[in-house]
Structure formats: structure tokens, C-alpha cells
Curated annotation (Swiss-Prot):
Family: Belongs to the SUN family.
Phenotype of gene-disrupted mutants: Leads to increased resistance to zymolyase treatment.
Natural source organism: Saccharomyces cerevisiae (strain ATCC 204508 / S288c)
Gene: SIM1
Annotated GO MF terms: hydrolase activity, acting on glycosyl bonds
Protein name, as recorded: Probable secreted beta-glucosidase SIM1
Length: 476
């Protein structure tokens, strides 16, 4: 199969809120952030086999721009970053590609039509060079390539007992369906996770732990074969992208996708409210990020031995509360790692789930910069299998979903955002607002997305939570 890599130069400015890594963002009183997008693309082709091995290596070309900060990201899912704004509190935001080049997506989709690779990022790759510059909003794309940026805000560390329930239908699986970017049909079981220490099996996308409780069993290096997925203790299997339950695989030749094999970093998803703890401290110098367990001598090993558990709870500051009748697939990007938008928070109609808020003060940093979480928000009624994947132009799903959430916490303050996806200007088929969870919670600012419009203007909106919790309310 073939996949293309795009070398992107993006020069930032303009106002927007989102969840991107790689850059520092200063919070303004109005909770706005700045970004601008100017694109320049260079295309190359890499051929890989069904296991993700590169058959024809491609030399990375990097487009440069006359600015002070240049970041190179190579041979992974399309990555772009940019953000800058004035304010009293300095925040860095977590990186994710908010757009995928139409040609890359279509080529990847056709090239993998006969494979079981659910995420087109398993068969498509890009290299982005990002530069920061302060000026007015500019958004231009060449070759119909909307690889773009969104800037998301950040985090804090507050924890209290969760009163929200998981899912009123937690024993009911999100519908089994055939993903639009894969030819294989797979199901996501939502029944209670079997064993918290199981080394195989998919379990539930809702996980085996009560909200903000556990984990209790430490991961043992060198005991689980690389071909067994270590579900349990908060780890959940991603069954619909054809990678053996892993949320992404980064291979020794810098290709991505395929099975977890010798020398690969095998990334995984954690249940809603949690984040993975595994990534090597020694990150690639070319700007890529790497995360997950290391497959060594046929067995799985932690890449971050400072963490005993594979998943950790974020800041208990945000819940998604649905007033809808249909389920909503909210898909977090897998970062550090491939940035596949496959990590699910699937909220059934009438139920609620915690939204993972990254504690930026302790979580992964990219070149010394803090990172936060970014989510792609699908229309109501889109299954998790169809929504939490790399989409294609016009599909309205995955990285082409109409809306993004940003979530992070730093210095005791949580920042939550509603962000437009530059890939898709269509309105969601429901509304969203961020409000205080109760009278004891303090949420500063207004953030509402209604009938496709944001209360903060075209660039989205952000609130800060200084105490208690906030709700992302989904309503008609």
C-alpha cells in the first residue's frame, strides 16, 4: 500500500481556540487564542507492506519559512501546529492535525480499500514544518489541502468525587458498523470489562475502572507478548482500525500502522477521563512524537519506567452531558504518537462521561512545551467505529467532523474550548455549551455553539474553570 507525506509550512496568527501542541499560548481575558494558516505542500510517496514496513523509503523534504521558530514533524499522521496570543497566563497547547490533505486522504482510502486498516493514518503520513509568526488571520490552502491548525487551551489538577454516571446503556455496544475508511467490519463491545489484569481481549470502550478510581495493578515489563493486547486497568482496545487493539503503531523505519512488532512503539487508548503514561523521554529530533509500549525481544516493555501503571486519571474538571436521544462519538487524538483520532469518549443519548482534562504541569512536553488534549466531535448518530478514524474530504467524520473540543489544566485552572474545524464549516446536528456543573463550581466566561455559530465569534470560545467542574452539554 502507498501513503503520501506532506511537508507543510504554516505561519501562525489570527484568533482561535483549540488543542494543539508545540507552541506556547497566552490566555487573554476573552479566552481567545491566535492562529493563522498559510500552507505550502511538497508531496512524496512511501510504500509499505501490510505490516507497515517501508518498502521504498522516502527522503523527507522540509519546507521552510522566514520566521524564528521552525518545527519539523515527519512521517506520521498529518500534523500542524500554530498559536499565539497576548495575556497574563501562559499556556501551551497540545498538537494535533485538524485537517487532512484531500489527496492524501483519498489516496490512502483507495490504497487501503482491501485492507483492514481502519485508520487511514495507518496508511498515510505527513511531515509538517510549522513556523510561528504574529500577524492577522491568514488562511490559504493550495492543492485543496486543508491540513490546518487549531489551538486549544490547557489545564489544572483538581480532583473530587465524580457524581456523573458512566452510561445509562453501558452494557450496550455502540453500533457495529463498517468504517468508511476501512473495508473491514468490526464491533466495539461495550459490556463490562472482564479482567482488570487481562493481557488480551478488547473489553469495553468505557473501561474497567470506576471514574477516578484506581488503577491498582502495576504493569509488569517483559511478561506480555507483543501480539497480545494488555487491556484492563483502564486500558481499552481499539478494535475498529485493524491494529490488534492498539491505537497506533510506530515502526523502526518511521512508518506507522500494522501489528505491534519488534522495535515498534505500540500506543494504546485509556478509558474516558484517563490518559496513557507511556512515551520515551528521548523523542525523535525530527519533530515526530513517539508514544506507547516498546516491543522488545518479543515482549512489551514500558517506555516510561517512572509510571507503574499504563493509564492515569486527568483533572476531574469536565464531563460531557448528553440531552440527546442518539449517541455522540468524541474522538481524542493519540498524542504523543501517531495522532490518530481514535481514542473514544462515546456518550450514549441521555448519559454522561468524564472528558479527559490533561494536567499540563505533569504530562508530556514537546521540546519543553506543555501539551493538552484535543477532540474531534462527530454528529449525533455516528458510531464510534465510523467516527473515531481518519476521515476523507466531505465525509464529515473523524478529522473532518464539524467541531473540536480542547481541554487542559495548568496552575490550578482548567481551560475548556469549543473550536471550529477548518476542514468542515458545516454545523453539527446539535448544539453544545460549556456551563458550571453546579452552584459550587466557578466557570469564567461564556462558551456556546448553537446552530453552527460560536458565542465567541467565528474562531470559537474558551472558558476557565477555577473550582469545581464544568459540563459540555449536548442539546437540540
Amino acid at each position: 500500500m502507498k501513503f503520501s507525506t506532506a511537508v507543510t509550512t504554516l505561519i501562525s496568527s489570527g484568533a482561535i481556540v483549540s488543542a494543539l501542541p508545540h507552541v506556547d499560548v497566552h490566555q487573554e481575558d476573552a479566552h481567545q487564542h491566535k492562529r493563522a494558516v498559510a500552507y505550502k505542500y511538497v508531496y512524496e510517496t512511501v510504500v509499505v507492506d501490510s505490516d507497515g514496513h517501508t518498502v521504498t523509503p522516502a527522503a523527507s523534504e522540509v519546507a521552510t519559512a522566514a520566521t524564528s521558530a521552525i518545527i519539523t514533524t515527519s512521517v506520521l499522521a498529518p500534523t500542524s501546529s500554530a498559536a499565539a496570543a497576548d495575556s497574563s497566563a501562559s499556556i501551551a497547547v497540545s498538537s494535533a492535525a485538524l485537517a487532512k490533505n484531500e489527496k492524501i486522504s483519498d489516496a490512502a482510502a483507495s490504497a487501503t480499500a482491501s485492507t483492514s486498516q481502519g485508520a487511514s493514518s495507518s496508511s498515510s503520513s505527513s511531515s509538517a514544518t510549522s513556523t510561528l509568526e504574529s500577524s492577522s488571520v491568514s488562511s490559504s490552502s493550495e492543492e485543496a489541502a486543508p491540513t490546518s491548525t487549531v489551538v486549544s487551551t490547557s489545564s489544572a489538577t483538581q480532583s473530587s468525587a465524580s457524581s456523573a454516571t458512566k452510561s445509562s446503556t453501558s452494557s450496550t455496544s455502540p453500533s457495529t458498523s463498517t468504517s468508511t475508511s476501512t473495508s473491514s467490519t468490526s464491533s466495539s463491545s461495550s459490556s463490562s470489562s472482564s479482567s482488570s489484569s487481562s493481557s488480551s481481549g478488547s473489553g469495553s470502550i468505557y473501561g474497567d475502572l470506576a471514574d477516578f478510581s484506581g488503577p491498582s495493578e502495576k504493569f509488569q515489563d517483559g511478561t506480555i507478548p507483543c501480539d497480545k493486547f494488555p487491556s484492563g486497568q483502564g486500558v481499552i482496545s481499539i478494535d475498529w482500525i485493524g491494529e490488534g487493539g492498539w491505537s497506533g503503531v510506530e515502526n523502526t523505519d518511521t512508518s506507522t500502522g500494522g501489528s505491534c512488532k519488534e522495535g515498534s512503539y505500540c500506543s494504546y487508548s485509556c478509558q474516558p477521563g484517563m490518559s496513557k503514561t507511556q512515551w520515551p523521554s528521548d523523542q525523535p529530533s525530527d519533530g515526530r512524537s513517539v508514544g506507547g509500549l516498546l516491543c522488545k525481544n518479543g515482549y512489551l516493555y514500558r517506555s516510561n519506567t517512572d509510571a507503574d501503571y499504563l493509564c492515569e486519571w486527568g483533572v476531574e474538571a469536565a464531563y460531557v452531558v448528553s440531552k440527546l436521544s442518539k449517541g455522540v462519538a468524541i474522538c481524542r487524538t493519540d498524542y504523543p504518537g501517531t495522532e490518530n483520532m481514535v481514542i473514544p469518549t462515546y456518550v450514549e443519548g441521555g448519559s454522561s462521561l468524564p472528558l479527559t482534562v490533561v494536567d499540563q504541569d505533569t504530562y508530556f512536553t514537546w521540546e519543553g512545551k506543555k501539551t493538552s488534549a484535543q477532540y474531534y466531535v462527530n454528529n449525533a448518530g455516528v458510531s464510534v467505529e465510523d467516527g473515531c478514524i481518519w476521515g476523507t474530504s466531505g465525509s464529515g467524520i473523524g478529522n473532518w467532523a464539524p467541531l473540536n473540543f480542547g481541554a487542559g489544566s495548568t496552575g490550578g485552572v482548567t481551560y475548556l474550548s469549543l473550536i471550529p474545524n477548518p476542514n468542515n464549516s458545516d454545523a453539527l446536528n446539535y448544539n453544545v455549551k460549556i456551563v458550571a456543573a453546579d452552584d459550587s463550581s466557578n466557570v469564567i466566561g461564556e462558551c456556546v455553539y448553537e446552530n453552527g455559530e460560536f458565542s465567541g465569534g467565528a474562531d470559537g470560545c474558551t472558558v476557565s474553570v477555577t473550582s469545581g467542574k464544568a459540563h459540555f452539554v449536548l442539546y437540540n
